[in-house]
């Protein structure tokens, strides 16, 4: 029974005292029994949390009651239980690490497209659909005919822009998981001379909820315990291949060698054969972890105390 929810959200807005707000926000999450990861910066708020339906309802009311977050939109998905083991509420320089700290999405971004508008535009001849996510994300799922960027992290995006100059005459439709990366990516594209830039409001997750995920090939990589999520209920497919043998597989695993910890698709047969390792070298590594068939190795709680960083 899916009586829990996963919330995904972000909001670019000015937070005068991130440390004070972190304290308040952390306490509210503890009160409501939420787990997850929340980042607070002077430029805004970014989070993904899980909790009971009632806990999530009260949390959304709490956040939306703050005038700074009146424009914030929650993406809500039903789940069987918590999608996280811990709660982290942290202050960082940016709400998503981008190497674009000078870009202010509250001043200028690409035009926001609702999922229905994105669906109507994406296949036009004068349009290019641009995936602004990292390799490990788009290798397991992406929109049909999307242009992908060879980058290990979003902070590499500014250096990759020069490879996209040939697209400047097109309408560029950017997308990412929940919309947050597109805020700065689309703004930076405009800064670099791209004139007609759009972004999928709410990202792949909202598109899956509102449009059934049509033409999203493969699975959506998510940053919680699920790792990948089914978003396409219309014409689903598998596009990722096993890192070891090359057969189709959307089963994401971490290499059982913790020193490597490579995150790649691996079919069940290769998982058993390789004992969860991505190579023979990793299979023989003295620190190799026992493989239980999942390829997931949750971090030990090691005396985790959710009140550890609370000052009052």
Swiss-Prot record:
Gene Ontology terms, MF aspect: oxidoreductase activity, acting on paired donors, with incorporation or reduction of molecular oxygen
SMART domains per UniProt: RHOD
Enzyme class, first EC level, given as a word: oxidoreductase
Xref: CDD domains: RHOD_YceA
Keywords recorded for this protein, A-Z: Oxidoreductase, tRNA processing
EC number from the UniProt entry: 1.14.-.-
SUPFAM superfamilies, A to Z: Rhodanese/Cell cycle control phosphatase
Catalytic activity: uridine(34) in tRNA + AH2 + O2 = 5-hydroxyuridine(34) in tRNA + A + H2O
GO biological process: tRNA modification
Domain of life: Bacteria
Keyword tRNA processing attached: yes
The keyword tRNA processing belongs to this UniProt entry's keyword annotation: yes
Pfam family, one: UPF0176_N
Disulfide linkage: none
Membrane-crossing residue ranges in chain numbering: none
Residue positions of the active site: 176 (cysteine persulfide intermediate)
Gene3D superfamilies, A to Z: 3.30.70.100, Rhodanese-like domain
Domain Rhodanese: 123-216
HAMAP family membership: TrhO
Function: Catalyzes oxygen-dependent 5-hydroxyuridine (ho5U) modification at position 34 in tRNAs.
Family: Belongs to the TrhO family.
UniProt protein name: tRNA uridine(34) hydroxylase
Organism: Cytophaga hutchinsonii (strain ATCC 33406 / DSM 1761 / CIP 103989 / NBRC 15051 / NCIMB 9469 / D465)
